[in-house]
């Protein structure tokens, strides 16, 4: 009965991480790429979208902390062969990583001039280099964040091998991270 409950919880965590990966990574690419540089959307709307992404990244950091705290407790209860230091170390890394993305998003927000938020998108003008540089810096931060997440997933897959569901989840996360990293890399070099 307890194993059945644990498997259901792992399945819910698997679906949640897929949804979160789509929201945090793909939404970052499409919103800042389309609304911020490739359309005539006013900058105040792009500013609100960036703030929404900032909230998602913050929620992602605290959800990682909650999930890995639960994982630490469950592994201690089940008597897994994964050491406590491994679980604690991976939890701290998973919480620190989204905060780097939060910092890069804040830098992108600060690069927007508050006096021109109500104007049309200045990226339509090819002579404006401020918006272009901020978008390029955001794509560069997305590339580094994806690679950091990829290395973290490889670390988790090599350490958590007791449950089949954990391995399936880790491999799926690696595939998503590779896909996001390739998309961000292509967007960075095409701009």
Curated annotation (Swiss-Prot):
Origin organism lineage: Eukaryota, Fungi, Dikarya, Ascomycota, Saccharomycotina
Main localization category? membrane
* Membrane topology per record: Multi-pass membrane protein
How is this protein annotated for GO cellular component? membrane
Organism encoding this protein: Saccharomyces cerevisiae (strain ATCC 204508 / S288c)
User: Has the keyword Transmembrane helix been applied to this entry?
Assistant: yes
This protein is called what?
Putative uncharacterized protein YDR413C
Additional observations:
Partially overlaps YDR412W.
Query: Where is this gene product found?
Result: Membrane
Record-annotated membrane-spanning stretches: 12-32, 48-68, 92-112, 168-188
Recite the UniProt keywords alphabetically: Membrane, Transmembrane, Transmembrane helix
């Amino acid at each position: 009965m307890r194993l059945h409950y644990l498997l259901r919880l792992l399945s819910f965590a698997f679906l949640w991480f897929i949804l979160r990966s789509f929201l945090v990574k793909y939404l970052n690419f499409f919103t800042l790429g389309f609304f911020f540089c490739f359309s005539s959307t006013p900058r105040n709307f792009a500013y609100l979208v960036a703030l929404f992404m900032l909230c998602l990244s913050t929620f992602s950091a605290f959800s990682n902390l909650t999930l890995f705290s639960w994982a630490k407790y469950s592994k201690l209860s089940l008597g897994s062969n994964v050491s406590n230091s491994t679980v604690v170390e991976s939890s701290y890394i998973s919480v620190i990583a989204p905060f780097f993305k939060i910092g890069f998003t804040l830098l992108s927000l600060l690069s927007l001039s508050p006096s021109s938020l109500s104007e049309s998108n200045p990226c339509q003008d090819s002579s404006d280099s401020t918006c272009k540089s901020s978008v390029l810096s955001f794509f560069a931060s997305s590339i580094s964040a994806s690679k950091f997440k990829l290395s973290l997933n490889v670390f988790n897959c090599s350490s958590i091998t007791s449950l089949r569901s954990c391995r399936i989840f880790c491999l799926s996360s690696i595939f998503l991270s590779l896909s996001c990293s390739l998309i961000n890399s292509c967007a960075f070099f095409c701009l």
